[in-house]
From Swiss-Prot:
Recorded superkingdom: Eukaryota
Cofactors, names only: Mn(2+)
Keyword Hydrolase: yes
GO molecular function terms noted in the UniProt entry: manganese ion binding; metalloaminopeptidase activity
Name of this chain's protein: Probable Xaa-Pro aminopeptidase MGG_05684
């Protein structure tokens, strides 16, 4: 059945709606971005931060992202607001600042103004009235008055600490009282407090992340509908980004990964340029932002044709089983590291069934050979960042391990692999007070993957020759052409379990869409 469509303006902000015309003359519209009347809960977030700071007085200062240009250029990069500032303000435009007086609970947003000539070139920025109507702040004031305000506040409240995020983001206070020199400036505690506040999402934040997931899931669905007609990884990326854009999502949460065949075995592959023909799998790891809040979704599909090869189907089913087992464990108090161990244990059991691994299961677990195929952490927090604050804590890392982060996935250290191996052998759940325990209001990813990266597998096994003794090389050779399989959903931890925020099709549902059995296919533009 044919369906006509047209783009129409639905409000004064020029939001676009996809108008669907059906043969009977009826129509339906899906606004790409409706005008929200709900204020951003800046005050709620500020109070959470103050609570985590554990103080009853003090002045918090945060600086928004200033206008910048590329190095040796007069061209501006796409604007991306500083996330710590956005969390406490909701202001998504450059050159703004905020102050929060803990004692009086006063949250002020300091905003710039543009002269008519600047507006001619750059357009207008939100006015005081705009900000007051959309953001839950006590007042919006002209930024030119800010330094005078802060200096006066510190002068008249000599016992007050000024909390800063970074030393290079301090307000320029020429008349800062001498007695403050190095003694009442706190640089360090604010970041920890904001991190602690951000890790548990407010209802507003959950709605934003859910919306980002809805848009991204529809974009993944659009790719599934068209994948048999696409020729390159670039085509896949283009379809996904376009589908997000027409639904009102202006930015991607991270650079999309569209890797086919061997490229699917590169965790952070972003070239997205190779042909799809002749490849067994396509890993599409892509998610949009909605008002600065991220989604993070991965789906694996046949790169060409209507179905997986037998080998790719086998690996897909294993990863699917890994993910289902892990998601079923999500609830408050559960150790995330234990969930990671569960994923690896499922992989070992399934590898033994297909003959990829041979030997005693306990010895295989202790050898950590499964990390040759599943080398990364199971997931991370999602929020204002794709890899949101405190994600390293999910796998028991401390700040000294920050260098182990590589993009969206954590490189498992030897120590962490040993801890996971111990959990696999003992099947022992850590206590609810563990630093990696889940809590209500967290949004995390569950993203197991299996990869056949020849160079990595050979190097991993050569480091400890015993590992290679557990791998059946002839079986392994059959699976190298698969490349890789990863499945990733965003999971909200609820009071008694979880809610899967991701609705992107996977498994048999995805294959039905690829094969044209999607009953909704004629009612969507992209």
């Amino acid at each position: 059945m044919g369906v006509e469509h047209e783009l129409v303006v639905v409000d004064e902000f020029d939001a676009l709606s996809i108008e669907l015309k059906r043969p009977n003359g009826s129509s339906s519209s899906s606004p790409s971005r409706a005008v929200s009347v709900e204020k951003y809960p800046a005050k709620t977030h500020a109070r959470k931060v103050a609570d985590k700071l554990g103080v009853d007085k003090g002045l918090i200062y945060l600086q928004g992202k200033p206008t910048t240009t590329y190095e040796d250029s007069d061209m501006e990069p796409p604007f991306r607001q500083r996330r710590y500032f956005y969390y406490m303000s909701g202001a998504d435009f450059p050159n703004a600042h905020l102050t929060y007086d803990v004692a009086t609970d006063q949250l002020l947003l300091w905003i710039p103004t543009r002269q008519p000539r600047e507006e001619l070139y750059l357009g207008r920025i939100p006015s005081r009235e705009d900000c007051m109507s959309r953001l839950d702040v006590d007042d919006c004031r002209d930024v030119v008055q800010m330094t005078r305000f802060i200096a006066a506040h510190l002068k008249h409240h000599p016992g007050t600490t000024l909390f800063l995020l970074h030393s290079d983001q301090a307000p320029g206070l020429d008349d800062l009282p001498v007695q403050y020199a190095g003694r009442r400036l706190d640089i360090g505690r604010l970041r920890l407090a904001v991190d602690a506040a951000r890790v548990i999402k407010t209802p507003f934040e959950i709605r934003q992340i859910r919306r980002a997931n809805q848009v991204s899931s529809e974009a993944h669905r659009a790719v599934l509908r068209q994948i048999r007609h696409l020729r390159t990884e670039a085509d896949v990326e283009a379809v996904f980004v376009a589908a997000c854009r027409v639904r009102g999502a202006r930015s991607q949460a991270y650079n999309p990964i569209a890797g086919a065949g061997a490229n699917a075995a590169t965790l952070h592959y972003v070239d997205n340029a190779a042909p799809l023909k002749g490849k067994q799998t396509l890993v599409l790891d892509a998610g949009c932002e909605w008002d600065c809040y991220a989604s993070d979704i991965t789906r694996t599909m046949p790169a060409a044709g209507r179905k997986f090869s037998p080998e790719a189907q086998t690996i897909y089913r294993i990863v699917e089983k890994m993910q289902n087992a892990c998601i079923d464990l999500v609830r408050p108090g559960v150790s995330y590291l234990f969930i990671q161990a569960t994923a690896q244990l499922v992989a070992i059991e399934e590898f033994l069934k297909i003959g990829l691994l041979v030997g005693d299961k306990a010895k295989i677990a202790a050898s950590r050979v499964v990390s040759a195929f599943f080398p990364h952490g199971l997931g991370h927090h999602v929020g204002l960042e794709t890899h949101d604050v405190r994600s390293e804590r999910l796998l028991g890392y401390d700040k000294s391990s920050a260098a182990l982060w590589r993009g969206k996935r954590l490189v498992m250290s030897v120590e962490q692999c040993d801890r996971v191996a111990e959990l696999m052998v003992t099947a022992r759940q850590q206590g609810a007070d563990a630093r990696d325990a889940l809590a209500e209001g967290m949004v995390i990813t569950i993203e197991p993957g299996i990869y056949f990266n020849r160079q990595y597998i050979e190097a991993f096994c050569s480091d400890v020759p015993e590992r290679g003794s557990f791998i059946n090389k002839s079986v392994l050779d059959r699976y190298y052409p698969v490349g890789g399989v990863r499945i990733e959903d965003d999971i909200l931890v609820t009071a008694d379990g979880y809610e899967n925020l991701t609705t992107a099709p996977k498994g048999e549902e995805a294959l039905r869409i690829i094969n044209g059995d999607d009953v909704e296919a004629d009612a969507v533009l992209v």
